[in-house]
Amino acid sequence: MTNQVPEPVTFGERALQIEDVLALANRQVPTVLQSDSAYRQRIAKGAQFLDSLLDKEGVIYGVTTGYGDSCVVAVPLQHVEALPRHLYTFHGCGLGKLLDAQATRAVLAARLQSLCHGVSGVRIELLERLQAFLDQDVLPLIPEEGSVGASGDLTPLSYVAATLSGEREVMFRGERRQSSDVHRELGWDPLVLRPKEALALMNGTAVMTGLACLAFARADYLLQLATRITAMNVVALQGNPEHFDERLFAAKPHPGQMQVAAWLRKDLAIDAPTAPLHRLQDRYSLRCAPHVLGVLADSLNWLRSFIEIELNSANDNPIIDAEAERVLHGGHFYGGHIAFAMDSLKNLVANVADLLDRQLALLVDERYNHGLPSNLSGAPADRAMINHGFKAVQIGTSAWTAEALKNTMPASVFSRSTECHNQDKVSMGTIAARDAIRVLELTEQVAAATLIAANQGVWLRSKAADARPLPPALAAMHEQLAADFPPVIEDRALEGELRLCLQRIADRHWRLHAQ
């Protein structure tokens, strides 16, 4: 058996999907740049057209003028070559944590894909070097704070422009290095950015878009995992599976809601009406799970559309139409679609946290868990009084849920006039994307805790005299989980197991519904 080499992602050849960015961010696929001569000539034509305008002393924003409100300031031709370095230099003021390696790769992929449209006036050499950064895993150290999301992600992307020029720092082979040293080691000459090239690199939405791709992928897996956890909790709490009847959902046919109900039926092995239970209706966190999770499921389609259109767009300013010999000044750097998508996603995901938190609250409370021990403790009767099982885990889950819900405040409504009122309406899309990532982190923590607790609940229920065999999908999941998370009989610190579960979620370890 041979290891199959994955097909490379060829920039400049086709539109990218979120899955392409995820694969690039995880170093799962190689990259190449379109080698077709006609394509390369088209890229070159944009840079040549700009040079011809300079020869004619044409006025081009950010090339022969200052930036932002300084666009009324003419830059003499003898200073035009120096302007790109000034742009990335004065924007070197980012703060906050550095983007991690996965996020940085996603940013590089998003910026390269945008510039490969050939309407930004950059040389093929710039595209080649960006692709080489991805290929060799040379990762600019990018502070995550400092963007208002219009004009694009200027400050964070200045770190891309600077490192391509051999300045500032990169992460390379696990070490924090000077970009100039890494260039020397790889035998590269640092780029000297030509007129418009620093602006083309920086004046776009690559940071928010790269983060949005990662957030979408995490939310998609979380949706499936939350559905599986719900099915396990239906078993642990002796819930009523008729709440997920296919005929019931035909009466209110939201597609995502119907999909989640179908997944639950499959997990619970329901293919026919079941015998009536003593409890006609479960609490909402079980009964209405398809209605909560279905909103996220239905939203994934339009979220994908917003993100992928942005990903595959030319989103800087000005746009260089070399064919028509025109320079088009506009506002494609405005990240409004990503801002709205991420503000919406964090609301959708926080509702998943709230749902799972409520399910865990039922599991640990002997007044509502239908015969399970208090706090899901597996201790024998003579030691029950000193064992507390999942009590603290449930408290922690409440804290994580509260923080997730707090972070759902939309970022896009906090537009601030800035840059001498030139940027008087801005998207805050990068803040929205960062918020969405944080809400996902917190919700994954809730999911990890609830998953381990649900598995404990299923185990405890299986010990009852009237226990039924687990449906196949849940039996397989229970067996997989038991290998990592043995039953809690005597109290033990669960931090390590929670962290392991989070890593399993990050790795998409369990094959779930749509995979």
Task: Tell what function each PLM region has.
Residues 2-57, 87-143, 234:
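Glycine-rich, flexible loop motifs
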Residues 2-29, 33-38, 42, 46-54, ...:
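C-terminal auxiliary extensions adjacent to catalytic cores
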Residues 38-41, 45, 62, 78, ...:
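Generic alpha-helix structural propensity
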Residues 61-83, 90-115, 143-165, 180, ...:
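FAD-binding core of FAD-dependent oxidoreductases
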Residues 85-89, 134, 168-169, 225-227:
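Glycine-rich loops and low-complexity Gly/Arg-rich segments
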Residues 119, 148-150, 385:
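Conserved, non-catalytic sequence blocks in retroelement Pol enzymes and Pol-derived host proteins
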Residues 128-135, 155-158, 162, 224:
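A broadly conserved amphipathic alpha-helix scaffold signal in soluble, globular proteins
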Residues 142-147, 323-327:
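Cysteine-centered functional microenvironments
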